[in-house]
């Protein structure tokens, strides 16, 4: 969301970070792999997903590998001049470097994995409540991809237990391409589905521009992605 991106240090230190422009984040499909254990509704999920570092499986601590990625989601009220929203719950989930999601056996399109073994696992999923600076931060790894989709992260926002936004965020392709030829990602290589032809992001160039993370960093040291979720509250 280029018009609403706030630099990391500014967003994390200023309780009322300024924004340039004020755009409602496009609503997108939830996707087939949200975390819903035992039929629990999304708004009722608590631990083990209340965490900043989402890289590990909660039950055994086994970590997903890949290039480090810090995600900073700023939540703003588009009905209030994009003022920061405190106390919003931001949920995220995404696939691992080989294109698989935790918690599901019936999936396809990834490589070098056994989806049936991922049932009951929780890696690369979590939620945080926006802090005094209206930022929810996550420590994760750069996602891979699976057939038919551009590289992406799913996100949802709840206010007072009510779902107020479902969305997905894309990555700049030049960065994804550089990541996906590094050692941890070579089993799949460069994503064959581009942002502009993706079934979610490809329907509007304007929406794609407003759904793309602002990225800093490199493949050696890792990346930081920043995104402002604009919601009319």
Which residue stretches match the model-derived regions?
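N-terminal export signals
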Residues: 1-14
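Beta-strand-dominated extracellular/periplasmic modules and repeats
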Residues: 19-207, 230-233
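C-terminal, well-folded lobe of enzymatic/effector domains
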Residues: 210-233
